[in-house]
Regions:
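Pro/Thr/Ser/Gly-rich low-complexity, intrinsically disordered linker/stalk tracts
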Residues: 1-23, 57, 70-116, 165-172
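Recognizes extended acidic, P/S/T-rich segments that occur
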Residues: 5-6, 22-58, 120-153
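A structural detector for beta-sheet-dominated domains
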Residues: 6-8, 15-17, 30-32, 44, ...
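Generic alpha-helix signal with a bias toward terminal, lower-confidence helices
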Residues: 12, 17, 26-28, 41, ...
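Beta-strand-rich modules
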Residues: 25, 48-82, 139-172
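Ser/Thr/Gly/Pro-rich, low-complexity flexible regions
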Residues: 93-172
Length: 172
């Protein structure tokens, strides 16, 4: 049933040949992410690939591929292993360059996979506590964003990147 596995940034694409069954309704992939959260991806009977996404960390993860007919009868699972590449959030964080900007900071970044992420910025208050300030949501490939509205005093800015699955980078 499974023909090929293409590991991608934060996931994999599983190519398969659907069973030759007139009663086939869909094919699904069942798996746990690195936080042991059970997830499923379902595609219709006319699709020949499953796109697995949302992994924050590289590693080897088992995935069960299952065919389901109109009576909701499931095939015996075919278990394969995927090995997601580095998640986009890490590459985005590593590409960031911050520069002082009028009333704040400008963050330039690269997002070659056009991942849907948020850049989350915090500052340190006078007691040294981290205080969340704002988020910028983007899926643009290469861009910059200015976090503004701050007094013209020395300010420590702290930033991290988060994806739509709640995966977060360390702070910088």
């Amino acid at each position: 049933m499974v023909n090929n596995i293409l590991n991608t940034a934060g996931g994999a694409v599983i190519y398969f040949t659907p069973p030759n069954d007139e009663d086939l309704l869909y094919v699904k992939a069942s798996f746990e992410d690195e936080n042991s959260i059970e997830r499923e991806v379902i595609v219709s009977s006319v699709i020949d690939s499953l796109s697995i996404v949302g992994f924050a960390e590289e590693g080897t993860y088992p995935v069960d591929v299952i065919a389901v007919d109109r009576g909701e009868n499931e095939s015996i699972p075919t278990t394969i292993n995927i090995s997601p590449l580095e998640a986009p959030i890490h590459g985005i964080l590593n590409s960031m360059v911050g520069n002082a900007d009028f009333g704040g900071i400008n963050i330039a970044y690269e997002n070659p996979t056009r991942a849907e992420v948020s850049l989350n910025m915090s500052t340190l208050d006078s007691s040294g506590n981290l205080v969340f300030r704002e988020s910028f949501y983007t899926s643009q490939a290469n861009n910059s964003y200015s976090f503004r509205g701050y007094d013209p005093v020395s300010t420590v800015f702290v930033i991290y990147v988060e994806d739509k699955w709640g995966n977060q980078t360390e702070t910088r």
